[in-house]
From Swiss-Prot:
Lineage of source species: Bacteria, Pseudomonadati, Pseudomonadota, Gammaproteobacteria, Enterobacterales
Organism: Pectobacterium atrosepticum (strain SCRI 1043 / ATCC BAA-672) (Erwinia carotovora subsp. atroseptica)
Annotated family: Belongs to the arabinose isomerase family.
Cofactors named for this entry: Mn(2+)
Lineage: superkingdom: Bacteria
Protein name according to UniProt: L-arabinose isomerase
Keyword check for Chaperone: no
Length: 501
């Protein structure tokens, strides 16, 4: 939630001089009460800031330009208290580059049947003023969201809050820097993609670094800093005998701490908030970064394995979106299946890199064990399971002419049986609507084998994100029917081809 404290959403009231000073004074007074009420009672993640009433095209244009250049402003929330002729908004909306939410509300909840007169009617014109504003948005093909409801309604609060989270994530996306240590895993297709196209679409940049650049920083870490981090490990986790003092793999734990400190310093020095590694590019490192990656994800960094920069960026963006919510968000991979009639399950995991924010255990196990991939020393890692609850897996892929997001809703379950020989963190879930349908749909749509797994975010967040980023979205949930899903793939292909002309 700390990420949101410095951010603002500007609350903008549109009107016109036609109504006279007394009506405009009352509009301003009502707006102040609405903003104060929302800030105090709606549990919104981002503060609303009331801006001066805009009544002319020049005022609207100036405000939109100002919003573009204020880094702490993540978007505009507009309310048409009275009628605001929408031609006045064309100039401002033409230049606006921040997310826009139209709050279709009114000051009073109910009609004052006994006292309502024409003065009241002229003051409270959201019902048609909002439609005028909506027309110009549609006419300009302006991507904006609409929330309808009274400003004291809890459902409206929830929807505004979700929009704020997505707006903050989009702001993060525009300034995000992703570091790739090494390259993509050789011969893997889905982790490739158009980095220039991604920067144009999402705003984030992706830069490659040789392992020598990283190892130079890792090698410079002092023994004192390593010892201090080891003390933190011993307080936070259940260490196995192998990594305790004088244990057979104690040095592996010391090496992991050194890698963590070096990676974090490298990322901080470069202003990176997401990164990738690749087990085929480990020259100069003593082990594949496992514990380091897990702990950096827990601190909010995005990560993708095998050079998967799209998933690394998406994880960081979703972590920002989920700030302060219960439940965690992690890098994930569908690893293996349990095909059992009536109990089909997916075991999600990775070689090492699963984020502890999704851990069920308060103190995960910390161990160093053999890893047959990478050809390095036994890597340290945290081992835990994941609590039951509603979850989702999200993936962004490059289709060549567009970016496609897939979201599969899943139901995470308690681990049904012990896994005494599995030395990695994991989550176990039932895919919606079934493993058979979900896997077939995912494969038909080209979904990646890497995903972002979240128990903090829901489909509303992801749908909003796709809409506000203007990317394709395919949802796999309990409503999915394969013949309809295949039709959607065909229709989308035509739609996006036409849109690209």
């Amino acid at each position: 939630m700390d990420h949101f404290k410095q951010l603002e959403v500007w609350f903008v009231i549109g009107s016109q001089h036609l109504y006279g000073p007394e009506t405009l004074r009352q509009v301003k007074e009502n707006a102040e009460k609405v903003v104060a009420g929302l800030n105090q009672q709606a549990n919104l993640p981002v503060k609303l800031v009331l801006k001066p009433l805009v009544k002319t095209p020049d005022e609207i244009l100036a405000l939109c330009r100002d919003a573009n250049y204020q880094d702490n402003c993540i978007g505009l929330l507009t309310w048409l208290h009275t009628f605001s002729p929408a031609k006045m908004w064309i100039g401002g909306l033409s230049v606006l580059s921040k997310p826009l939410l139209q709050f279709h509300t009114q000051f009073n909840a109910e009609v004052p049947w006994d006292t309502m007169d024409m003065d009241f009617m002229n003051l409270n014109q959201t019902a048609h003023g909002g439609r005028e504003f909506g027309f110009i948005g549609a006419r300009m093909r302006q991507a904006h969201q609409v929330v309808v409801g009274h400003w004291q309604d809890k459902n409206a609060h929830v929807r505004i809050g979700k929009w704020m989270r997505v707006a903050a994530a989009i702001q993060e996306s525009k300034q995000l820097k992703v570091a790739r240590f090494g390259d993509n895993m050789r011969e893997v297709a889905v982790t490739e993609g158009d980095k220039v196209g991604a920067q144009i679409q999402f705003g984030y940049s992706v830069s490659a670094w040789g392992l020598g650049d990283l190892t130079a920083v890792v090698d410079a870490v002092s023994k004192g800093d390593i010892d201090a981090l080891i003390e933190e490990y011993e307080t936070s986790y259940q260490l196995t005998d192998a990594v305790k003092l004088n244990g057979a793999n104690r040095q592996n734990l010391l090496d992991a701490a050194q890698i963590e400190l070096g990676m974090k310093r490298f990322l901080e020095q470069g202003g990176y908030h997401a990164f990738t590694t690749d087990f085929e590019n480990l020259y100069g490192l003593k082990q594949l970064p496992g514990l380091a990656v897990q702990r950096l994800m827990q601190q909010g960094y995005g990560f993708g394995g095998e050079g998967d920069w799209k998933t690394a960026a998406l994880l960081r963006i979703m972590k920002v979106m989920a700030g302060g919510l219960s439940g965690g968000t992690s890098f994930m991979e569908d690893y293996t299946y349990n095909f059992q009639n009536g109990n089909d399950l997916v075991v999600g995991s990775h070689m090492l890199e699963v984020c502890p924010t999704i851990a069920k255990e308060q103190k995960p196990i910390l161990d160093a064990q053999h890893l047959g991939i990478g050809g390095k020393a036994d890597p340290a890692r945290l081992i835990f399971s994941t609590p039951a609850g509603p979850s989702l897996n999200a993936s962004v892929i490059d289709m060549g002419d567009r970016f496609r997001m897939l979201v599969n809703l899943v139901d995470t379950i308690e681990q049904p049986r012990p896994l005494p020989k599995l030395p990695v963190a994991r989550a176990i879930w039932k895919a919606q609507p079934s493993l058979e349908v979900a896997a077939e749909a995912w494969i038909l749509a080209g979904g990646a084998h890497h995903t972002v797994f979240s128990q903090a975010l829901d489909l509303d967040h992801m749908r909003l994100y796709a809409e506000m980023q203007n990317i394709e979205l395919l949802v796999i949930d309990n409503e999915t029917r394969l013949h309809e899903f295949k039709d959607a793939l065909r229709w989308n292909e035509v739609y996006y081809k036409l849109c690209s002309r």
